[in-house]
Amino acid sequence: MIDREKEYYMKTDKIKNKLTSPASRRTLWDLGIILMIVTVAVLTAYSVNGIYPFGSQSIARGDMVQQTIPAGMYYVWDVLHGKANPFFTWNSGLGMNISGAVSLGALFSPLNLFLYFSTRSYLYQFVNILMILKMIAIAYAMYFYLRKYDTERIAYVIGSVLYAFGAASLVHFQIMLVMDAAFLLPLIMIGIDRIFEDRGSLFFIVFFTMAMMVNVYTGCITLIYLLLSAGARTFLEDDRDKAIKKKWILRLGVSVVVSLLLSAVIVLPALRSIMEAPRSGDGNFLNTYMTALQAQWSDYEWSMVERMCVNMALPVAAIIGFVILAARSSGYVKKYRGHIFVVIALLLSVIIPSVELLWHGGSRASWPVRFIYVISFVLIDFAMLLYQDHRDRESKPSKTSTDRWLSVVISLVVCIAAGRIFYKIYEAYCGQAAYATLGDGFLCLLVEAVFAGIYVFLLKSHRNRLAVLVVLCAQLAVTSVVSFAPNKENSTVFSSGYLEQANNVAKNMETETEAFERIKNTDYKIDHIHYPLVLGKQAISNYWHVISPDLQPNFSALGYSINWTQLLDAGGTIFSDTLLHIQYDLSYRELPGSMYRLCENIDNGNGEQIGLYQNNLELPFAIQTDTQELAASGEKFDTQNALYQAITGSSDTLIRDVSADINGSVYSTQVGAGRKVLYFYGTNSTEQPVSILVNGEQIYIPNSDTSENISYPKDFGNGLICLGSFENETVEVQFSGDVDASLLHLGWLDYDMLKSAAESIQKDNGDITLLKQKHAGVRLKIENVTKEYVFLPISYDKGWRCKVNGKKVTIRSIDGMMSVPVEKGSDSIVLKYSPSGRKAGIVISLITLLVCLAGAYLLKKGKITQDQKGIVILSSVAYEIFGIVYAVFVAVLFAVPVLYYLKGILISTQQ
C-alpha cells in the first residue's frame, strides 16, 4: 500500500514538474499568441462587416443556412444534451435513418463539443463564435505537428495560424466538415511520423479511426493523401536500409487496416446509407471513372477555386526561394524529391478537373477542391522543412518578455488597421461593374501576388521573423474581410435571415408539443427546409440530403412536395395530415376556421406574425386495420382514397375527382350542404406554369424564392394545393397560362365524411394505454384489439425490428407507413431501429478491439514474442504489394487523367 502511494505521488510530481517547466510555459505562451492572432484577425473582419457581436449580420450563408447549422449545430446540441439520437431522428420524415447524413456532416467531430458553451436559443449567434474556436483548434493541432522541426518558436506560430486561415476555414467553412478534417490531419500526421520512427502506432490508430468515424467522406480523402505521401516518402526520400523501409510499410499498413476495422461500427452503416441514397451513382467504378475523365471546369467552379487561393503566398514564396537555394548545393534536391512530387501532384489535382473530381470519388455537388486542407498542410509542411534546413543559425540574444509583448501588440495593431483599411478598398471594388465578372477570385489572386512579393523580399533581404509575422497578420485580416463579407451565397433560401427567423420562432413559440405531435410549414413563410431541427419539433420537412430512396416517392404519392433530395411539408390533404399526426400548422396566411383553430401568433423577428394553428381533427396514433400492405397509386387522389379505405374499412370515396369537369381554363360548380375541401395538383412542367384564381382570389403556391409566388409547379410547391373550404356557395376556379387542361386535376374532399370517420375510429379503435417514444424506437400498448393489423404513422424502413407480445413479427408498408401484425385482445408493441450494417460493424469493431487489447497485453507480459523471421517475410510481402498498389494509384489518379486532359487540349488546338 505504501509503495503504491509513493508511486502515485512520484507520478503526480512528475506531471506537475512537466506542466510548470520552462518548456511548458513557452508552449503556453505560443498557444496564447496563436489564440490572440486568430481571434483579433477574425473579429476585425466581423467588425468591419457588421457581423455579430459587432452587428446583426452573420457568417451563415449558403449550405450553412439550410443544412450545416440546423443539422451540425441544433441537432448535435440536442444529441449532446441527450435529447436526440445521432443515427436516427424523429424530427424529420416521420422517423428516418440518418447514419449517412451524420457521417457526411461530421456530426461526430470532437470540435462539436464547443456547442456545450452555448444555449440552444443562442446557436444562431454562436456560429460566429464557433468559427473562431474551430480555427483556434485547427491552429493548435498544426502547432504540435510543426514542433518536430528545429526552428524558432515564431515559425511554429506563423505556420499554425497560416494553416488555420487556409481555404478550409475561409471558404469551405460553409460546409464545416472540411474544417473538421483540417483539424484531424496534423494529428494523423504526427501518428504517421511516430510509425515512421518506430515509436508506436497507437497515436495514429486513434486519430485516423476518429477521422473515419467523424466523416467517412473526408476520411477517404485523407486516406488518399496518406497513400500519396507515404509512397513519396518511401520511394523518393527515404535513404534508410530497405529492410527498415519494409518494416515501416508493414507497420503503416497494419495500422491503417486496424483503424478501418475499428471504425466499422460507424462507417459501415454510413456507407450503406450513402450508397442507397437517391443521389448516389450506380456504383460502377468504370462508368464513374470514365465520366470523371470527361469533366470540365465550369465558370462558377473555377471562380470558387480562385477564391481558395488565400494565405498561400508565404509558404509558396518560401518553397520557391529555398528550392532554388537548395538546387545550388549537390544532393539537396534529392532530399526533397518526395515533397516536390506531392506538391506537383496536388497542383495537378487543382488544374486538371478530372483529377480533382477523382479525389471526391468521381462526383460532387458544387464545392470543388474539398481536399484544400491537404494542399495547405503540404505547402506549410514543406516550407517549414526547407526553412529548418536553410535558416540562419547564428545565435542571437533572446528577447525579453517586454520585447515579446511589444512584438505581439505591433502585430495585432497592424492586423486591425489592415482590416479596416482594406474594407474600404473591398467596398469600392464591389461597387465596380467589373465585380460581377471578376468576383472575389480575382481579388484573392491579386492579394496573394502582392503579399508573395513582400515575403520574397523579406525572406531574401532581411529574414526578419517579426517583420514576416507583422505582414502575415495584415494578410490574415485582409483575406478574412473578403471571405466573411456577407455579400455572397446569400440569395433566396440561402440567406441567414431565414435561419434567424426560424430561430426566433423557436424562441417565441409558447405552445408545447408532445412526442409524435407533428408540425407543418404550410406556406414556407418560414423559408427553411430544416426548420424542425431548429424548432426542435417533428415534421416531414428535411434536408438531410442522404435519405432512403423510398421516402420521396412515398410522400410524393400522398401529394407532398419534393425537391432534389429534400422532403417538404407543403401539400397533402387534411386527411393525410390528420392520419400522419400532423396536428399543428405554421402559416402566414389565415387558415379556414372550419378546419383549424388559432393557437397563437408568433413573432418571427422580422415584424411579421406567423400563425400556429391546431388541426380540429384527430386520429389515434395507432389505428386498427384489416389491410396488411398497400402500395401507392400513381394518381394522388386514388392514393388518398385507397389509404382512407384501408384505414376506415369503408368503400366510400373520400375525394371525388372532378378533373373531367374543367371546361377550357374554368371549373365552376355549386357546393351544397356539407363542408367540402377543394384540392388541386398538376402534371404540367415548370416550362408550362399555371396560376389559379378561386372566386376571383389569387391562390399562392409555396416557393423558396417568395411567399407571394402564384405559379405552379415550383420547388416547394409541386404536390397537392388546397384551394379552400366551401359549403352552400358557388365555386369558380380559373386557370391562367397556356396549359393543356388534361394536365390539371381537381378533387373535392368530403370533410364531413372525414370528420365522421375520425369520430368513429376514436370510438371503436380500442385504448392506447402506453405510447412512449424512444430515441430510436417506440413502445406502445393497445387494449381491445379486434383487427389483424395496426397502422402506425412512422416511415417504413427495412431497419425496423418489431416484437408484439414478445414475439418477432414482420412489418409491412401501407403507403410508406407501417403495418404491424397484432393479436386480438391486448398487444404490447416494441419497435427498435437498427440501420443496415450496424450489427456487422459492431462485430467487426469489437473483435478488432479485443484482438488488439489482447495482443498488446500478451506482448507486454511476455506471453508471446515477435517472430522476427515472420515479420521479415510479412514486411517483404507488404512492401511489394504497396509498390504495386502505389504504381496503380498514381497511374489511375494522375497519369491517365493528365494524359487524357492533354489529349483533349491537343485535339482542341488542332481543330
Predicted regions and their residues:
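Active-site-proximal, structured, solvent-exposed surfaces of multi-pass membrane proteins
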Residues: 11, 18, 22-24, 72, ...
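Hydrophobic alpha-helical membrane-insertion signals
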Residues: 18-100, 488-504, 511-533
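Membrane-interface coil-to-helix junctions
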Residues: 40-138, 161-183, 221, 274-279, ...
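Periplasmic/ER-lumenal interhelical loops and adjacent helix-loop junctions
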Residues: 62-81, 110, 247-341, 348-373, ...
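Extracytoplasmic/lumenal acceptor-recognition loop(s) of multi-pass membrane glycoenzymes
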Residues: 94, 100-104, 472-492, 508-579, ...
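A cross-kingdom signal targeting lumenal/periplasmic-facing segments of multi-pass membrane
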Residues: 111-115, 542-663, 668-674, 685, ...
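Membrane-embedded helix bundles of polyisoprenyl
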Residues: 132, 136-148, 153-237, 251-271, ...
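Contiguous transmembrane helix-bundle modules in multi-pass membrane proteins
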Residues: 199, 218, 336-501, 721-723, ...
